[in-house]
Amino acid sequence: MRMGLITPDPAHPLLAATAALLAGRHEVDVLHPAAGAAAAAGASADVYLLKARTPAALELARALERGGAPVVNSAAATERCQDRTGMAELALGAGLPFAATRTFASLALLASAADQEWPLVVKSRRSRKDDLVVRLDGPDGLRELAPRWGAEPVVTQAFAPNSGWDHKLWVVGDQVFAGLRRSELATGAAESPRGPERLPDGWAELALRVGRVFGLDVYGVDVIAEDGGGPLIVDVNAFPGIRGQAGAPEALAALALRRAAAARQGR
């Protein structure tokens, strides 16, 4: 079978390991997403893995889908994870334990709102590399951010007291991987990542449910354990790096082969 990787970085550890597993019996092609839909011309893989989130990458994914090729994750599912306002609306509407989220057209408008309770988590509305994710303990923090981020559309979430560790849940197909990462919002000295982690009862099923709600096959779910012990989802990411998780490349290779085989049978 023939697999396609949509990525500017085929040497990424997850992709490189997956490609190595497939290369013995299958062809693996790399499509750089910079060319957008034009890169779909002549493309003939049985399945494509979308490890990019730029507008050009999504344009390429949509072009491949129009041609009948399966893309993991789909362009639509990937886009759902880029708008944090829509993400929260979808998750809360489906009954997922997602952090309550407010939207502001700009950080400057947030600064003018009089009804904020502190501390507050402020994030860029559009999820992307090097976006804004910060905990603020009062209005002074907003003023410090204004020169760089004043025009940035943002969302806010109330800061939920927690241990300072993010539970990272990664899903590939029906397999759930997990680890602990020191929260970027935590105070105090940085600590090394922990993992793998034994998840509390019900958390693995919660992660799989997120995939069904968002239409995702390869994704990450950021969860914090509230003081009462219950899970609170604070972010969902399409096709994260899943670094250092034993078995993740094998799970991704198996998923790609299943999707490719299903596509061939459907022709």
List each language-model region with its residue ranges.
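Short glycine-rich anion-binding loops that position phosphate/pyrophosphate groups of nucleotides
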Residues: 53-55, 126-127, 239
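A short beta-strand motif that forms the metal-chelation/ATP-contact edge
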Residues: 45-49, 123, 169-171, 229-244
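A long amphipathic alpha-helix within ATP-dependent nucleotide-binding catalytic cores
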Residues: 186-233, 237, 247-266
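Conserved N-proximal alpha/beta basic substrate-recognition cap immediately N-terminal to
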Residues: 2, 7-100
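Hydrophobic alpha-helical segments and helix pairs
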Residues: 81-130
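A short linear hydrophobic-aromatic micro-motif
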Residues: 100, 119-122, 154-157, 218-221
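Short, well-ordered alpha-helical microsegments
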Residues: 14-15, 56-59, 110, 142, ...
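Phosphate-binding site of ATP-dependent enzymes
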Residues: 131-214
